[in-house]
Curated annotation (Swiss-Prot):
Functional summary from the UniProt entry: Catalyzes the formation of N(4)-acetylcytidine (ac(4)C) at the wobble position of elongator tRNA(Met), using acetate and ATP as substrates. First activates an acetate ion to form acetyladenylate (Ac-AMP) and then transfers the acetyl group to tRNA to form ac(4)C34.
Swiss-Prot/TrEMBL catalytic activity: cytidine(34) in elongator tRNA(Met) + acetate + ATP = N(4)-acetylcytidine(34) in elongator tRNA(Met) + AMP + diphosphate
The protein, known as: tRNA(Met) cytidine acetate ligase
Keywords for the protein's UniProt record, in alphabetical order: ATP-binding, Cytoplasm, Ligase, Nucleotide-binding, RNA-binding, tRNA processing, tRNA-binding
Positions with a binding annotation for ATP: 7-20, 102, 176, 201
């Protein structure tokens, strides 16, 4: 058994994901695939278009064998924390042979050598970084300059000696390269036997909002869905199984979810918790004062985000910060989990027969607990990390479903994490 690990959001699963899946299997000679997938809220600090079970089912229908939920506390954070959670899960399974991710760079060796320097932080590199930061450069620019200087001083790293500062900076700051470097850094920190691979992203940029071919970015699809929920205009850019499942959800009253839908809930929390806003993760440096001031004059969430945005606070950073407030994510809880080197449990969202084979392998090779639904938990809840992780997953699901099920309230019998089974795809 040769098991490939994938780290995904599938928001939604489109033709580019089919390409990534097939090329990853081809590159690694994998016989089985496991996807670690974000739940109902995502790394950009926004809700998923459709619920985690629907997205997991679509993934398995399109060729993934097993989908495991990435806990909310990891799923909604920076690339560093997001990657740490996903890689820690894969490493804790003790049966994953490789990971494969898309990147703008497309060269595993280059990304690995960059990650190795950033993971080990040699003294020369740290001194160079400090110098550029002391010169007043922003961290991304300072890091690129320090890395460029270090590489040209260290003869071992001739793999990118010909890169200019601009090329290196672009490599370091491209969306998928950032995640890929963080994946590899975490593999190094964990001394993992999992082998990293990458494939080049094709045609569409990660953040592109244009639909120009049959492979486009998820961003472009989300932008299109926000303007028109009729899926017919997306038929050429998503697989048939994705199209059919999402069409059925929409026909049954489950509309795509966007962050503005949660603005009233967020506004209530901000007005109620003004005195304690700084307890939420990423609420630092007095930003709570700007949030409180601008909440009164903002009619929509996007309006609030843009009002707070500045050179110091990027839009993505603002979105994550506000999402942390929405989900009640506290600094103290993030401190508890952000450096753990094992995960106490995995939550299964969907699987097929080959996924069953993977689960059997996990049971044979790992002590990790496997959860199908929270009502079936039969082991001790004394584990603080375990309790912290699942409590936020439950909160996130409940908050998400309060809007997602507004046209289907009769289907909600209580906290759905307690009674929803993993989806088996024959």
């Amino acid at each position: 058994m040769n098991i490939l690990g994938l780290i995904v959001e599938y928001n939604p699963f489109h033709n580019g994901h089919i390409y990534h899946l097939s090329k990853s299997i081809e590159k690694t000679n994998a016989t089985h695939t496991v996807a670690i997938m974000s739940g109902n809220f995502l790394q950009r600090g926004e809700p998923a278009l459709f619920d985690k079970y629907t997205r997991a089912k679509i993934a398995v229908e399109n060729g993934v064998d097993l989908v495991i939920e990435l806990p909310t506390l990891f799923a909604c954070q920076s690339a560093e924390i997001f990657s740490h959670g996903a890689i820690t899960i894969l490493n804790s399974l003790n049966c994953i042979n490789s990971i494969c991710f898309g990147s703008e760079e497309g060269n595993t060796e280059i990304l690995y050598n960059i990650a190795e320097i950033l993971a080990n932080e040699p003294n020369k590199f740290k001194l160079l970084l400090k110098k550029y930061l002391d010169d007043g450069l922003l961290f991304p620019t300072a890091r690129a300059n320090a890395l460029f200087d270090y590489i040209h001083q260290d003869k071992k790293n001739n793999f990118i000696q010909n890169y200019s500062k601009e090329q290196l900076s672009k490599t370091l700051n491209s969306s998928n390269n950032i995640l890929g470097i963080e994946y590899i850094k975490n593999l190094i920190h964990l001394n993992s036997s999992i082998k990293p691979f990458t494939i080049s992203r094709v045609q569409s940029e990660y953040n592109s909002e244009e639909i120009e071919s049959d492979i486009c970015s998820a961003t472009a699809i989300r932008t299109s869905l926000k303007e028109n929920t009729d899926l017919f205009h997306l038929k050429n850019v998503i697989p048939e199984k994705t199209y059919n499942i999402l069409n059925e959800k929409i026909d049954n009253g489950f509309l795509p979810m966007f962050d503005d839908f949660f603005f009233d809930i967020l506004k209530t929390i901000i007005l109620r918790d003004m005195d304690t806003l700084k307890e939420y993760f990423e609420v630092n440096e007095g930003i709570e004062n700007r949030i409180y001031k601008d909440i009164f004059t903002s009619e929509f969430l996007h309006e609030l985000q843009l009002a707070i945005k500045s050179k110091r606070y990027t839009l993505t950073k603002i979105k994550r910060t506000l999402n942390n407030i929405l989900l009640g994510i506290k600094k103290s809880d993030m401190q508890l989990i952000k450096n753990i080197d094992t995960i106490p449990y995995i939550r299964i969202l969907a699987f097929n027969d080959k996924g069953r084979e993977i689960l059997k392998e996990i049971k044979n090779k790992s002590e990790i607990k496997i959860i199908n639904k929270f009502s079936n938990i039969s082991f001790s809840l004394d584990d603080t990390i375990f309790k912290t992780l699942i409590s936020y997953d439950i909160k996130a699901t409940n908050i998400y479903n309060s809007i997602y099920y507004k046209n289907n309230k009769d289907l909600v019998k209580g906290p759905m994490d307690f009674y929803t089974h993993p989806i088996y795809v024959k």
